[in-house]
Structures are given as C-alpha cells and as structure tokens.
Amino acid sequence: MSVVFVAASKLPTPFGEFTMHGFLDEESGKEHVALSMGDIADGAPVLGRLHSECLTGDALFSLRCDCGFQLEGALAAIAEEGRGVLLYLRQEGRGIGLLNKIRAYELQDGGADTVEANLQLGFGADQRDYAMCQPMLAHLGVSSLRLMTNNPRKVKALESYAITVAERVPLQRGLNKHNRRYLATKAGKLGHMLGSLHQGEAETT
C-alpha cells in the first residue's frame, strides 16, 4: 500500500485545537486524515481511535448508528488528556460506500438487520481494511496505542501491522431507540464488546 503524507494544518474544534494531517492512498485515490494533539511521538502509548467515515452519523446527526457520538466522545477524551490521535478513514458504510449504505438502510427499513442487508447486497458484513493505518501512524511516530474501540477486529488488525495495542478503552456512546437493534447486531453477530446491555442479545423488531 502506498500511503503518502500530503500536508498538515491547525484545526480548531469545540474540543480544542488539533493538528490535521492529510494522507493520500495513491492506489485507491482515497484521502485519509489524522487529528493529533500533544506530543504523540515520545514512545509512550497514545490514546487513539480509528474512526471510519460515516457521513450520516458524523455530519447529518443520524440516530441509526453510534458513529457521530463515538467521534465526539473520542475527540473529547483526547482533548481532556491533552494528547492523542484519531485516524479518520474514508471507509463509508463499513467499506461499501455511501450509496450502497443507503441501499442497505432501505433493506433494513424492510426488516433486515445491518449484517443481513450487507449480505443481501453481495458484500461482506464488514469490508473495512486497516492497512493504511500503519504508514499513517509511522509518519506520526506512533507505535503503541491505547485504542478507543468496542471492535476486537481493530485490535487484531493493528497488531497484525506490528502496532502495539497497550490497552483497549471502551467507547460506548449514543444508545437510543433508533440504534438499539443495530448495536445488538454488532454485539451478537460482529463480536463488538458493548457490555451486558447488548452482548449476546438477540435482535427483536
């Protein structure tokens, strides 16, 4: 994978000022971003998150998922600590793209769960790839993370690229009546660690 650094700038946010680092995957043409705060290249484990793009949750305030809540929670946690990094990865809809995500939502409106909808469209349950994280983190001087995630697949992916996950930090935000079924599916079918509220819970309509 050929991921190259392009530019960096300051990014003031309601949580504090971050540095925004832009990267280009020359093979896919996708543009990824890292937001950093503080000295993250000192060798100590860094509070961090891998956040896949979710236009509906991150920008359009959708309650169908917990993505926007997790994004805000991660940035707030980094700002509170004064040190950390968030990789914003252009992998909309667990890797199937925005329009296919809307198609999947249409199937979910008809009764399918989030995994069934992907499979009915001919996709895997989760098509995301985290290979781009290794060169992005290497550029930033980060080799060890305290990873904010509920997804064990992210932990395994980073470790496969020789990035140490010193700690998994749970990030549970935004449960509501619109996403309860979705989160139950992530726990029951995708193995997400969401606590007793969802773990092993079967979906009900």
From Swiss-Prot:
The keyword Zinc applies. One of its GO terms (molecular function) is zinc ion binding. Its EC number is 3.5.4.25. GO terms for biological process: riboflavin biosynthetic process. Signal peptide: none annotated. It catalyses: GTP + 4 H2O = 2,5-diamino-6-hydroxy-4-(5-phosphoribosylamino)-pyrimidine + formate + 2 phosphate + 3 H(+). Binds 1 zinc ion per subunit. Pathway: Cofactor biosynthesis; riboflavin biosynthesis; 5-amino-6-(D-ribitylamino)uracil from GTP: step 1/4. Belongs to the GTP cyclohydrolase II family. Catalyzes the conversion of GTP to 2,5-diamino-6-ribosylamino-4(3H)-pyrimidinone 5'-phosphate (DARP), formate and pyrophosphate. This is GTP cyclohydrolase-2. The lineage of its organism: Bacteria, Pseudomonadati, Pseudomonadota, Gammaproteobacteria, Pseudomonadales.
